[in-house]
């Protein structure tokens, strides 16, 4: 390990805005399987990590924290939490938040598989998935797969939105398929964010009727793609855009967690950390969201391109 990383890890310990729990703080038991247990911060983020109580917006796989930092500046009436497992990446965002005395930004270093151990039902208003790994060979490792969506809706407020922004056409199409398979409400969907209006829209404004339900606590969404979706760019987005990849964007709602799924939140069985990602509990075992069973096979029959590509050329299904 390089001296630079060691220095960042040491400085991470000094940042009050960065929470770095040890694995045994959220895992109980021995052997191949572990039981997930609640962390003390669960239900207490507003009182323990921020300078004032506000609706909480979560970014999963935040990397260097560019989205969290920029959104926090644009929306001071909301609290933002960036989650990632890489401490060297989190250092940049935590450093910037600390230097600029940003009281509405926090970071959490943990595996996203453990995310429900940190948030109480209704504690999070909105979720962003920005340029996460498409996990071409492991469906259950995709952050927008039914198994992860079941975890999110245990703590996402009623009417809460999930934003997916990615250079991977594969992940975008897969997530669309998940939404359609489960009749999830799609608010915006564009396969080329910087060159087109949202699919099913005119001049960038959605034609879908209806307004936000009263239970929604996130920043107002009036049927248009928010300016920050295009204006805020992560390190990876900038890199992929320069390489010619199209950026896709999808926004959808999750229904509230069913009673049986919520009740299982305190007794979730987690796989051994050394086990393959797709050896996890299957979606039907933890909730009611279904996987688009034939999507992967159909996709690769429809698209020319190597399986190892991070992103794929544009295509029509």
Where are these regions (language model features)?
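Conserved beta-strand signature within the Rossmann-like core of class I S-adenosyl-L-methionine
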Residues: 159-166
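Conserved SAM/SAH-binding beta-strand->alpha-helix loop
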Residues: 86
């Amino acid at each position: 390990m390089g001296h630079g990383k060691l220095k960042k890890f040491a400085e991470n310990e000094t940042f009050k805005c960065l929470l770095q729990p040890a694995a045994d703080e959220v895992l109980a038991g021995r052997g191949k399987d572990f039981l997930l247990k609640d962390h003390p911060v669960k239900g207490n983020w507003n009182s323990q990590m921020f300078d004032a109580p506000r609706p909480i917006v979560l970014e999963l796989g935040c990397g260097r924290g560019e989205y969290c930092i920029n959104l926090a500046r644009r929306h001071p009436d909301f609290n933002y939490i960036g989650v990632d497992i890489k401490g060297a990446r989190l250092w940049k965002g935590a450093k910037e938040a600390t230097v600029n005395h940003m009281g509405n930004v926090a970071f959490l270093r943990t595996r996203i598989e453990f995310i429900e151990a940190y948030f109480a039902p209704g504690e999070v208003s909105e979720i962003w998935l920005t340029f996460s790994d498409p996990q071409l060979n492991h469906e259950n490792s995709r952050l927008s797969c039914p198994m992860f969506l079941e975890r999110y809706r245990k703590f996402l407020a009623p009417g809460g939105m999930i934003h997916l922004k990615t250079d991977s056409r594969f992940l975008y199409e897969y997530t669309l398929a998940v939404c359609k398979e489960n009749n999830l409400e799609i608010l915006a969907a564009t396969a080329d964010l910087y060159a087109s209006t949202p699919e099913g829209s005119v001049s960038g404004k959605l034609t879908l009727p209806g307004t936000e339900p009263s239970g929604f606590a996130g920043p107002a969404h009036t049927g248009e793609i928010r300016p920050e979706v295009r204006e805020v760019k992560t390190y990876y987005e900038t890199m992929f855009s320069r390489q010619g990849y199209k950026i896709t964007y999808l926004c959808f709602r999750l229904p509230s967690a069913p009673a049986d799924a919520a009740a299982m939140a305190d007794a979730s069985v987690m796989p051994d950390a050394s086990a393959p990602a797709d050896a996890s509990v299957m979606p039907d075992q933890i909730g009611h969201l279904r996987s688009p069973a034939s999507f992967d096979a159909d996709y690769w029959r429809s698209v020319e391109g190597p399986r190892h590509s991070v992103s794929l050329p544009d295509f029509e299904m």
